[in-house]
Structure formats: C-alpha cells, structure tokens
C-alpha cells in the first residue's frame, strides 16, 4: 500500500502491478490532454495572456501527474510534505529560499522603476502556472531522473555530486527546445545556465531533506519571482544594487550548497530508497 511518503512498498508484486496500471491510465489521460492543448491549441478565452496561463497550467499539471505516479511506482520516499525532521529540513533549505525570493525585483518594485499592469485573475492564473511548472519539472527531473541516476551509484560524495551534474545538465539542456519557438539564442543559453544552477540547488535540498515538496516550492517561487514583472508588468528589472545583492547572495549560497553536499553521507539517502525512517 501507499505510505505517507507516497511510496509503494518496494517488494510486493501486487503493489507494483497496481502502480503500473495507475501509471498507464494517467499516461493515457495526460497524452490526450497534451494532444488537445499542444496540437489542437484550443482558445479558451480571447485574452491571449490568460489563454497562455490556462494552457500551461493544464498541460504541466497533466505531466506532473504522470511523474508523481512514477515516483510512487519506483517507491521513492520523497512525497511526505511534513517528513521528520521537518523544521530542521526547512532550516537547511532557508538559504535556497533566499536565492529564489531574491529573484523578485524587489528594489525596482519598491522605487517604482518596475510595476505591475495586471492583477486579480491574471495574478491567480500566473501563480497556478508557476506551481504547475514546479510540480512537473521537480517530479520529472529531481523525483525521477536524479533519483534514478543516484540509485545506481551512490557509494561516495563524488557519486552524489556527479548524479547532480548529470541530472541538472539534462534539465538545462531540455530548454534548448525553446529555440523552436523563436526564442533568442542568447536568452536560451542564459536559461540553460540558470536552470542548471536551480536544478543543482534543488537536488542538494532533496538529498538532504528527502522532501520533494520543498523543491517544488523553491522552483515555483523562483519562477514566480523571476517572471512576475515580465509576465504581468513592465519596467527595469535589473538595477545596480539588485545585481550586487544577487551576485553576493549567489556566491554565498553556492558555497553553502557545495559544503552541504559534500557533508552528506551516502547512507543518508537510504531513507529515500528503502523503509529507513
């Protein structure tokens, strides 16, 4: 049966079969949804901004459902949102939250050089889009890809490090598809870079906390803060003080994450892969 971590017991064949059936059903439903929205491109509203939010939210939620079922099928114990020691895990992740919150152009919004032009329903659906992307990408790239890579080889801190590099590189490279929608080459390269870094940071948090929901929250907040003004407003996002603060914070948290990673003992990950509490 399924425990609080969302993981099936890893041995009984019957449970595996149930998860296999569930996975096939969810995949079939998700495939239909993706076909309807990505190929059919339905117009749910004449407002192009809202229509984009609707489409992204529905398709990413469908994709997330597939990968959450697969996490259960694999038996990875990362889905308990209040897994003990929760408060210690939250404390460990605080520097990462500082990074993602700093992605919001706080100073430009405060001094008026940036401002929002949309609110209300637009803001609600923008939040929904950010959450759906966080759910989908964290389930796929941390909950499945990273944990599958790490499961095969995790005898040392070096193994844990290279698992993160491999999974984060794939996560970054997948953004090359944005070139197909006429995104600028420079913009895509920049997106690959910060996707690699945010992926690596979330990977360390997952290793240390065994809590995928913290990764989802980090990812969603990062996307929300970074895209708020471009999506729902206008103005200058980067000013000199913001750049200086961002660089200092990025360097400090990078050092923190590297030290944290190499202090993680490989056996700590046993609680993700088996029934160790």
Description of each model-found segment:
Residues 36-46, 103-113, 176-183, 228-233:
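Juxtamembrane "helix-exit" motif on the non-cytosolic side of transmembrane helices
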Residues 18-26, 52-60, 88-92, 122-126, ...:
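Residue-level signature of transmembrane alpha-helical entry/exit and packing/kink sites
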Residues 126-276:
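Transmembrane helix-loop-helix hairpins at the membrane interface
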Residues 62-63, 102, 174:
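Membrane-embedded alpha-helical transmembrane segments of multi-pass integral membrane proteins
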């Amino acid at each position: 049966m399924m425990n609080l971590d969302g993981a099936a017991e890893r041995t009984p064949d019957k449970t595996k079969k149930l998860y296999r059936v569930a996975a096939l059903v969810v995949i079939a439903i998700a495939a239909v949804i993706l076909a309807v929205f990505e190929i059919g491109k339905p117009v749910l509203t004449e407002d192009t901004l809202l229509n984009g939010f609707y489409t992204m939210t529905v398709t990413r939620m469908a994709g997330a459902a597939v990968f959450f079922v697969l996490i259960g099928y694999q038996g990875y114990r990362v889905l308990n949102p209040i897994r003990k020691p929760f408060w210690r895990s939250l404390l460990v992740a605080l520097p990462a939250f500082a990074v993602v919150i700093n992605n919001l152009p706080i100073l430009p919004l405060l001094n008026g050089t940036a401002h929002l032009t949309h609110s209300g329903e637009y803001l609600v659906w923008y939040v929904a889009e950010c959450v759906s992307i966080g759910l989908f990408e964290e389930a796929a790239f941390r909950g499945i890809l990273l944990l599958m890579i790490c499961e095969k080889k995790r005898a040392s801190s070096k193994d844990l490090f290279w698992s993160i590099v491999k999974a984060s590189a794939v996560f970054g490279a997948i953004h090359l598809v944005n070139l197909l929608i006429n995104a600028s080459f420079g913009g895509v390269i920049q997106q690959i870079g910060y996707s690699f870094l945010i992926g690596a940071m979330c990977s360390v948090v997952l290793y240390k906390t065994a809590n995928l929901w913290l990764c989802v929250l980090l990812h969603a907040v990062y996307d929300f803060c970074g895209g708020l003004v471009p999506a729902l407003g206008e103005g200058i996002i980067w000013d000199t003080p913001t750049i200086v603060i961002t660089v200092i914070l990025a360097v400090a948290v990078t050092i923190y994450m590297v030290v944290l990673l190499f202090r993680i003992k490989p056996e700590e990950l046993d609680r993700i892969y088996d029934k160790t509490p």
